[in-house]
Amino acid sequence: MSHRIPAIVAITLAVCTVSGVAIFAQAPTSPGALTRSRYLPEYTATGEMKLPPNSIWREWVFVGSPLTPNALNGGQANFPEYHNVYIEPGSYESYRKTGVFPDGTIFFKELQLTLGPSENPDGSRTEPSGRGYFPGAFNGADVTVKDSMRYAQTGGWGYFDFNHNEPKAATTKVRSKSECAFCHIASAKRDEVWTQFYRILDEVPLPDSTRGGGR
């Protein structure tokens, strides 16, 4: 006599906390379900954001790297000089599927100076590949976090400066609306994000409910 053991499919949603970071793990059980865990921002007891540990942002999804050389900006660019931008992978996966940046989204912009010394007034130099700009030393970081409730006064996003030099600050306070959010609200293309400068973000279709209405 043969016996058949019925298959049991377990669908789980696990939430755990590790070192003050909420990590969500969800099995891919339905269309749109996330297939990876998410790293969410950590804060101190006084509300300062903590620098993500162990340079983990360098393992995230690379979005792009605009360049604002000091030599082309009066000797001191506002964000010198390479803007190496990464997005937390779970947030990117959700954005690709929905066209919406979910709460908890983290953009990490690691600044990096051009390789010196420059050989020309515009700050460029010549290497075997040609004349141009080449990445040099790291130079601090800026971080943007989406939290519709915590940052309701600045359009749902919080902006953080972890120094524009090395070493990066271990913690930092959210910036005021006039320092960061105002410019994003006025000029960024989609949900206060400069998607117009990052092709892999800009090519994601808008949700049907907002199609054609992005900034």
Predicted regions, residues:
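N-terminal secretory signal peptides
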Residues: 31-100
